[in-house]
Amino acid sequence: MNFSEGIKYIRKVAYLSQESFAKEIGVSFSTVNRWERGKSKPNYAAMKKINAFCNANLIKVDFDEDDT
C-alpha cells in the first residue's frame, strides 16, 4: 500500500478520526489530512511518532518501498 493509504489504514484500524489521530501523534489535523490525500509526507520526527503509535497499538503496515 502507498503511504497515504497506510496512514489512513493505521488511523481506521485504531478507530480514530483524523483529528484524534493527529492529537495522538502530536501533529495538526490538517497535517494528517494532507498525508492521507498524498499532498505531503511526514518528516523523520513524525515517522518516529507514527511508528511508536503503531507499536503501542500492535498495528503492522507494509508500505511500498518506492513510496517511503
Residue ranges and their predicted role:
Residues 1-2:
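A detector for short, charged/polar N-terminal pre-domain segments
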Residues 44-63:
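DNA major-groove recognition helix of helix-turn-helix/homeodomain DNA-binding modules
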Residues 65-68:
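Short acidic DE-rich linear segments
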Residues 12, 23, 55:
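Short polybasic/polar patches that bind polyanions
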Residues 15-33:
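Short alpha-helical DNA-recognition segment
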Residues 5-20, 49:
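Short basic helix-loop element that most often maps to the first helix and adjoining turn
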